[in-house]
Amino acid sequence: MYAPRELPIVHVSVRSSEMIKYASNDFLALKISYINEIANFCEIVGADIEEVARGMGMDRRIGSNFLKAGIGYGGSCFPKDTKALNFQSDHAGVKLKTVKATIDVNREQRTKLIDKARRFFPTFRDVRVAIIGLTFKPGTDDLREAPAKQNIDILLNEGANVIAWDPLGVENFRKRYPDCAINFAENIDEALTDADVCFIMTEWEKIVEYPLDNYKKYMRRPLVFDGRNCYKLSEVEKHEIFYDSIGRKIVDTL
């Protein structure tokens, strides 16, 4: 099974092998939470997290992998393994403070876009909200621990009218959350039509390549909150839009 790939085989104890898996995933999750905290600070001091992450990643001791700011990690591995290691350490009487901090930061980061949008909508009652992207990452229909569902629940509890689009995740969302009272769009144009605000939750290629002019064309007012930094600010500035992303300056050309 492994010989054709010429992979190194490390002989360790069962306990050590388990710890390698937990420690590796938790360290990667920590990198994500760390860069998200730095991104939040960048917004206050006027730095650009894309530039900061690029500079950090050039240091071989750090590396550029998992230094992508956004609205937190999801999926089946990182949430499960961070919580498991935190539980096991507590049970053993050891406080793994960095692991707990990783979990706490990620939990708060997941609703960052709603927090940002409060400047326009103290409450979302009767607000038409477009959710662009449902899955925890592009290229999958996996909704486990995806930030979109948590945000949708908050919006619905406040009385918002939510319409969502995702190229792969819609059917899985319907099956997984049959009682979730939202509408689904066939394409991004339909999701944006007459929307008061747009939240980008997943960096699908179709979103990255989506024409920025269309936000103004279809929305009542182009208020866009991007949780995955899908667009270059230099391109956003060429269009009539309010655009707030993660760890970067706000573009307001309205």
Name what the model sees in each region:
Residues 1-254:
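Structural/interface elements that position substrates and couple domains in central-metabolism enzymes
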